[in-house]
Amino acid sequence: LIPINTRADARADHLFQLKQPLSHTGNSTMQLSRLVLASALALAATPAFAQSAGTWTVGIGAHNVAPKSNNGTLTATPLGNLKMDVGNNARPTVTAEYFLKDNLGVEVLAALPFQHDIDVVGVGKVGSTKHLPPTVSLQYHFGQGKVRPFVGIGVNYTTFFSTKTEGPIAGTNLDLSDSWGLAGHIGVDFRISEKGALRVDYRTIDIDTKVKLNGAKLGTRNTVNIDPSVYGVAYVFSF
């Protein structure tokens, strides 16, 4: 009987030794699972660019205003039909946005005065003007991730000033009326830190102005359609 018990004990010891590696493997799997879970929680806890209800963002950047290629024709003027061409210009810009909800904000755009050359096709430069284009937009921001696109629609008011004449109309008084129009806005915020992001954006603005020379309507059709594309970059920080 003793040899039989000895063999049984030996088998029990052998089975116990086989079970130990399996137990070790189970512990390793559990530890790995805990590590993966901890990493996932840490990633989820990484702060997103703070754009939530009640917060403000301010953006400082530079934008180029590029009027559309065909700005309209002034018809039946003393100089005949004049096809207008308004030049591009880039200036520093600033935006301020207040978030009504986590994804919805109201933004105001301001800038240093833009200056544009005014050309008549076939004649050349006939003047220049400056304008300010304050724009108020309602904007929707998608998601809460590192890359956050947005869209917006708003109203633009453009005022023209410091208009000068030269060339064939030098010495005359050229007047450009102020303009109200719709504005569309799309862009993407790329998070850099909890409080900062790099923004790339594009706007299209409806700007139409009526032209007068020495106080008189210039031609039978005196509207110049500027309708620019506005694109640029900005650094946006929240508080």
Stretch-by-stretch model annotation:
Residues T29, T46-A50:
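Sec/Tat signal peptide C-region and signal peptidase I cleavage site
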Residues Q115, S193-F239:
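Predominantly the C-terminal beta-signal and adjacent terminal strand-loop region
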Residues N64-K68, T95-G167, I226-F239:
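Gram-negative (and chloroplast) outer-membrane scaffold detector with strong preference
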Residues F49-A96, S162, A234-S238:
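Short glycine/proline- and aromatic-enriched beta-strand/turn motifs that initiate or cap beta-hairpins
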Residues L1-T29:
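Short, Lys/Arg-enriched N-terminal segments with co-localized hydrophobic residues
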Residues A50-T55, N103, G143-R148, I192-K195:
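Short loop/turn motifs that connect adjacent beta-strands in outer-membrane beta-barrel proteins
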Residues G54, N88-P92, S128-P134, V147, ...:
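Residues that define the transmembrane beta-barrel architecture of outer-membrane proteins
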Residues P78-L82, D119-G127, P168-L174, K217-T223:
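Extracellular loop and loop/strand-boundary signature of outer-membrane beta-barrel proteins
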